[in-house]
Amino acid sequence: MKVSLIGAGNIGGTLAYLIASKKLASEVELIDVNGDLARGKALDVSQTLPLIGYTMKINGSANMERIKGSSVIIITAGIPRKPGMTREELIDVNAVVMKEVGEKIKKFAPKAFVIVVTNPLDVMVWVLYKAAEISPDKIVGMAGVLDASRMNLFLAQELGVSVADVKSLVLGSHGDSMVPLFRHSTVSGMSLPELVSVGLITKDKVDSIIERTRSGGAEIVALLKTGSAYYTPAASVLEMAEAYLLDQKKTLVCSVMMRGRYGVEDDIFSGIPVIMGSGGVERVIELDLTPDERRMFENSVAATRKLVLEARKYF
């Protein structure tokens, strides 16, 4: 199986290594406008193969035509955030990149399963979907998998438990209006409301963890100063790609086409739980949201809708 990575920056390079280390594909194409950067990272990852004990092809190029025959295409290309920037401030620059990439996918790999990572995430998935004209169930954005991982860590640290025992659920946009679901998040099977009721954690502490989850990316951007997070985004995308390539039928929160789902009637993308397998988005899980949860989710979708209006000028 062939996986193409569009963008050879920190996330793209990390993904190339993770795919090789997990022996997930027989061929990886690492593509970047800076061909030497792509070739250099491809060569570096290739030299780990004897240590991994796995034979595969890892190529670096600036030529988008090399995405032909890809089973999965992962897009990380674009400008990352700098300290003080919001994801939304990247729209004008990254929408142009997404449109160009989408047109190439339409021409060279229209049957590939596409995962978008570029921010502002939900808007960029929409731009690429419009440009590539592919099935809505064959394109997703990396959203809730990353956000839930951050929330899982913060809860585990606060409670002093294994991260493996914590399961969080974060819906909505991959941005400040994301919706971490308090009552659907669990620790060893106990919901957060139950943990609060028995005094293992306070509601105020849970609220502070939710806020830290919302600003988790910005916290890292402020510390790095020259870029944004890449290890956890890469690991999150890998989980999504595995679910597709290995037909795992795995429940993941991804940014998907919302039309006809959760009461949304237009072509907006947002994060909801889906079953991911070899058919792409094979099924949507419609959660029974409380009035407050639904209001927050609708506000999140509305925030994305407003940004999509800005991106429509490119079509």
Swiss-Prot record:
The keyword Oxidoreductase applies. NAD(+) binds at residues 7-12, 32, 94, 117-119. GO terms for molecular function: L-lactate dehydrogenase activity; L-malate dehydrogenase (NAD+) activity. Pfam families: Ldh_1_C, Ldh_1_N. The active site is at 174 (proton acceptor). SUPFAM superfamilies: LDH C-terminal domain-like, NAD(P)-binding Rossmann-fold domains. Keywords: NAD, Oxidoreductase, Tricarboxylic acid cycle. It comes from the Bacteria. The keyword Zinc does not apply. Its EC number is 1.1.1.37. It catalyses: (S)-malate + NAD(+) = oxaloacetate + NADH + H(+). GO terms for biological process: lactate metabolic process; tricarboxylic acid cycle. Substrate binds at residues 81, 87, 119, 150. Disulfide bonds: none annotated. Belongs to the LDH/MDH superfamily. MDH type 3 family. Catalyzes the reversible oxidation of malate to oxaloacetate. This is Malate dehydrogenase. It comes from Neorickettsia sennetsu (strain ATCC VR-367 / Miyayama). The lineage of its organism: Bacteria, Pseudomonadati, Pseudomonadota, Alphaproteobacteria, Rickettsiales.
